[in-house]
């Protein structure tokens, strides 16, 4: 095998690789020898079909397999011999006009992972915004919890339904005067004001009494889940069989005991623990964002353009999806186009920051243990139906890239913990409102403060895509954390 370097510029590497016909022939002979024992033909004992006959029957497909393997092995040997670490899968192009029996010449193109420069962490300064879970906050949370545990009592016969009441109805839905599939039901409970039904349904039941019949006129939303009902006007013939009023929950020892606890004090302790966990999560989110901002400002090394392009494409697809659900999707898309360069800069920042975090983790011997990985797999499997969980686990164990994506957030959090230990941290007591406002202020700042490595937020918590006259720019969608640097095929 011969290799010739044709480009060495920055992170870009191009090679011409020649694999001799003799090497390919040896690989074909090996493929035939390995396939022969598995071939069964009438007149031959199992596994005793002559290699020449196997070659005659399956030679073309075996030759193609052998060529592909020879090319892949050649590329791997090239990378090993040159000590190159590609950032993504190399591009391989076989010279046009190749014929079996001749030398194979291929062009190999890739970008290498950059060397991440050493920086000092002595200047890392962070402010930890802390919120106390005081008695007032605990009482308010318990009150909210009690309201969600509410039960209903029978009302007087002449009671008119109000918001908050539970109305039990039988109904027949009609479109163009004809009942439609799924539009008929009985003994359905409707909590007025809960907003669980199509617009207008609950509102038109306000004032209804037990035994009363009404015709409710509604319009199905344009985004309704049933296609043939989208945007359709409909009427529901409704009969109210019962109206029940909410029972006010009293927060006391009896309420706590109804939840299986010993006392109200135990409920308060549990609620305090949950609130503190939530507040600590918000505090960490703010600190992590500030930390990543400082790290991003500290690094300026070149990053692989392929990784940036892949990251940008991922951002852009998510933005296009969000824009397609705007009232004026064309205006939202046009606004996105104006900011294309900014989103590309965000993609570059993400890649650089991901590589830096991976490098810091590697130099500090950060690892995700097998027990931790098993726990991550188990947690991820819970999102699937019980019948599908084992298949998911088996698939994950066979797919290194999927496993890397699952491992990445925990790996990154371990790196962040190390950096927290190295940083100079000062504490400042704030209210929850002030902490959330500080996080939102970070969220609203697009370029510099794009917090792509924060896993604590859901996509639904992000601002909606920008409309034509909106004053605020849409933040780039979140991505998964960067894995260790040795995962070459992706920055994920």
UniProtKB/Swiss-Prot annotation:
GO terms for cellular component: cytoplasm. The keyword Transport does not apply. GO terms for biological process: 'de novo' cotranslational protein folding; cell division; chaperone-mediated protein folding; protein transport; protein unfolding. Its main location: cytoplasm. Residues 440-492 are annotated as: Disordered. It is an enzyme of class 5 (isomerase). It is found in: Cytoplasm. SUPFAM superfamilies: FKBP-like (SSF54534), Triger factor/SurA peptide-binding domain-like (SSF109998), Trigger factor ribosome-binding domain (SSF102735). Residues 164-249 form the PPIase FKBP-type domain. Residues 464-482 have a biased composition (Basic residues). The keyword Signal does not apply. Keywords: Cell cycle, Cell division, Chaperone, Cytoplasm, Isomerase, Rotamase. It comes from the Bacteria. It catalyses: [protein]-peptidylproline (omega=180) = [protein]-peptidylproline (omega=0). Its EC number is 5.2.1.8. Pfam families: FKBP_C, Trigger_C, Trigger_N. Involved in protein export. Acts as a chaperone by maintaining the newly synthesized protein in an open conformation. Functions as a peptidyl-prolyl cis-trans isomerase. HAMAP family: Trigger_factor_Tig. Belongs to the FKBP-type PPIase family. Tig subfamily. NCBIfam families: tig (TIGR00115). This is Trigger factor. The lineage of its organism: Bacteria, Pseudomonadati, Pseudomonadota, Alphaproteobacteria, Sphingomonadales. The gene is tig.
